[in-house]
Amino acid sequence: MACKRYLPPNRLAEFLKDIHPDSKKTIGFSVENRSIEMITIGTGPYTILMWSQMHGNESTTTKALFDFIPWFLDSDQELLQAKCTLYIIPQLNPDGSHRYTRQNASNVDLN
């Protein structure tokens, strides 16, 4: 699925479904009740937390994650998958993403 410049919350759901549907979990909800999703991949003892779009209008890292995830899931990366568990939150601020603003729905910059 091609990812354009801006990735609103509804498009994020499409990407999550296509990339790794079994590992998705809702970990919370935004001020405006949009789900905040996390993907867990890998089985190793080394844990890595990755998140993006803390600022809703900055989706470049989100798109990079969706390039990274298929690479990590490739069978060539089995050793890495066995050593690491990745917790990926691809859109930390879905309200800001929906509005295309840096702040969340409460006008708070999440930095």
What are these regions (language model features)?
Residues 20-23, 43-47:
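Short glycine/proline-enriched coil/turn segments at helix->beta-strand junctions
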Residues 37-45, 53:
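Short beta-strand-to-loop junctions in surface cap/lid or active-site-entrance loops
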Residues 35-38, 75-76:
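Short, charged beta->alpha transition segments
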Residues 28, 42, 92:
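Residues at the C-termini of beta-strands that transition into short coil/loop
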Residues 1-36:
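Short glycine- and acidic-rich boundary segments immediately preceding or forming the N-terminal edge
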Residues 45-51, 59-111:
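Active-site/substrate-binding loop(s) of hydrolase catalytic cores
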Residues 56:
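Short active-site segment of divalent metal-dependent hydrolases/proteases
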